[in-house]
């Protein structure tokens, strides 16, 4: 497990209310577009657990301000960064093309590698991960080992609910 191996450490959130609103607005715009175009994506938002050691194993540093346009570009099919997860810290995209250990839990056949990876990371840290299915455009959140299907119209509300959970 990551915590036992000290690959995840704790940190405090430093976002103001306005910055948090900006984060949520940018993610909502990106997820709405990714879903509409059935562009597969896995986006992890760090909460208090620092994912640096995981990123450094497989990811590509980005270190750019979060914007819907940049997320859409990263996940555009065929680009070198579109496979794997993108990790957001605060309002910055810090890494892309990060590969997570998938969950070992049995899932029904309708879930692919993105969903398994998103559940896997949520089992070992407190991050909140957004998954957009390439096949259906459906959106899910993963948090603490749970996969939560979310209609796009309810994304902002559901995201806030899990983002603010302790």
Give the positions of each predicted feature:
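Divalent-cation
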Residues: 2-166
């Amino acid at each position: 497990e990551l915590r036992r191996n000290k690959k995840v450490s704790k940190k405090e959130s430093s976002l103001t209310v306005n910055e948090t609103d900006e984060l949520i607005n940018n993610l909502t715009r990106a997820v709405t577009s990714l879903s509409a175009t059935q562009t597969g994506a896995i986006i992890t938002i760090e909460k208090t657990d620092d994912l640096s050691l995981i990123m450094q194993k497989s990811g590509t540093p980005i270190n750019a301000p979060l914007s819907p346009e940049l997320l859409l570009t990263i996940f555009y099919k065929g680009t070198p960064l579109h496979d794997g997860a993108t990790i957001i810290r605060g309002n910055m995209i810090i890494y892309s093309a990060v590969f997570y250990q998938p969950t070992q839990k049995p899932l029904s056949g309708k879930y692919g590698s993105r969903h398994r990876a998103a559940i896997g990371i949520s089992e070992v840290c407190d991050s909140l991960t957004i998954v957009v299915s390439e096949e259906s455009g459906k959106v899910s959140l993963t948090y603490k080992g749970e996969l939560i299907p979310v209609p796009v119209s309810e994304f902002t509300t559901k995201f806030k609910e899990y983002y603010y959970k302790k």
